């Protein structure tokens, strides 16, 4: 090994969305040192990046002991991703389903690039854990969110950097209702309310329209998944 990594430390891919906010809480409950990394890649919903500070402040209030675990908050600018992509996340076009069965919100290579940049940063910081909110249970079919893809990439990164990163994807087999339930388990109603009010999911960057599950247009695939998960989470809570 060319670099000794601390496996009680983790770098969380933290966009400011529901999934990454839940993953950050999950990581803080398990690791001794936690840093975060967000990406500004020309996304239409860049407002998500503005949500991160509020979420971090809220997490510190909910669990004061987490404040001592939180380290640097990193942001990388990679506008080239928008330059080479022709998608509804990086262009002002209507969201639609493509002929390949994927929505045109799919940004080819996005998660592959994100994790590669994250690994390079973690290598320099001596961090052994990488944490991402990817999921193939309740998602839009993106191939770079799949468990097999991410395991293969982790193997390639470890071979290419001669090291031993561990990739953690705590939401991989959870649907959106289970993600809300995980937030409840980690921080009670306070964490659920924090994520509902201050995380951002909407692909169109809408923060003016308030719903019971949070803010968003209510129509894009991301909003629909979040709304469906919230409804099922609430119904399950009522049933019990």
Curated annotation (Swiss-Prot):
The keyword Glycoprotein does not apply. SUPFAM superfamilies: Adenine nucleotide alpha hydrolases-like. ATP binds at residues 14-24. Belongs to the QueC family. Its EC number is 6.3.4.20. This is 7-cyano-7-deazaguanine synthase. The keyword ATP-binding applies. Pfam families: QueC. It catalyses: 7-carboxy-7-deazaguanine + NH4(+) + ATP = 7-cyano-7-deazaguanine + ADP + phosphate + H2O + H(+). It comes from the Bacteria. Its cofactor is Zn(2+). Keywords: ATP-binding, Ligase, Metal-binding, Nucleotide-binding, Queuosine biosynthesis, Zinc. Coiled coil: none annotated. Catalyzes the ATP-dependent conversion of 7-carboxy-7-deazaguanine (CDG) to 7-cyano-7-deazaguanine (preQ(0)). Zn(2+) binds at residues 202, 217, 220, 223. Pathway: Purine metabolism; 7-cyano-7-deazaguanine biosynthesis.
């Amino acid at each position: 090994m060319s670099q000794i990594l601390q496996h009680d430390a983790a770098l969380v891919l933290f966009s400011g969305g529901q999934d990454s906010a839940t993953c950050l809480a999950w990581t803080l409950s398990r690791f001794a040192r936690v840093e975060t990394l967000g990406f500004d890649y020309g996304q239409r919903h860049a407002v998500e990046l503005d949500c991160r500070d509020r979420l971090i402040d809220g997490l510190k209030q909910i669990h004061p002991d987490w404040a001592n675990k939180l380290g640097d908050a990193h942001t990388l600018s990679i506008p080239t991703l928008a330059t080479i992509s022709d998608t509804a996340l990086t262009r002002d076009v209507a969201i639609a389903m493509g002929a390949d069965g994927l929505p045109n919100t799919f940004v080819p290579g996005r998660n592959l690039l994100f994790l590669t940049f994250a690994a390079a940063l973690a290598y320099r910081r001596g961090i052994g854990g990488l944490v991402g909110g990817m999921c193939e249970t309740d998602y839009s079919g993106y191939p770079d969110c799949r468990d097999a893809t991410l395991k293969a990439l982790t193997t390639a990164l470890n071979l290419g950097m001669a090291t031993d990163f561990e990739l953690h994807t705590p939401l991989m087999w959870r649907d959106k209702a289970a993600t809300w339930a995980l937030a409840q388990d980690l921080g009670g109603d306070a964490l659920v309310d924090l994520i509902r009010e201050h995380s951002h999911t909407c692909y169109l960057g809408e923060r003016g329209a308030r719903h019971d599950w949070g803010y968003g247009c209510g129509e894009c695939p991301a909003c629909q998944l979040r709304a469906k998960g919230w409804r099922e989470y609430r119904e399950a809570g009522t049933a019990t």
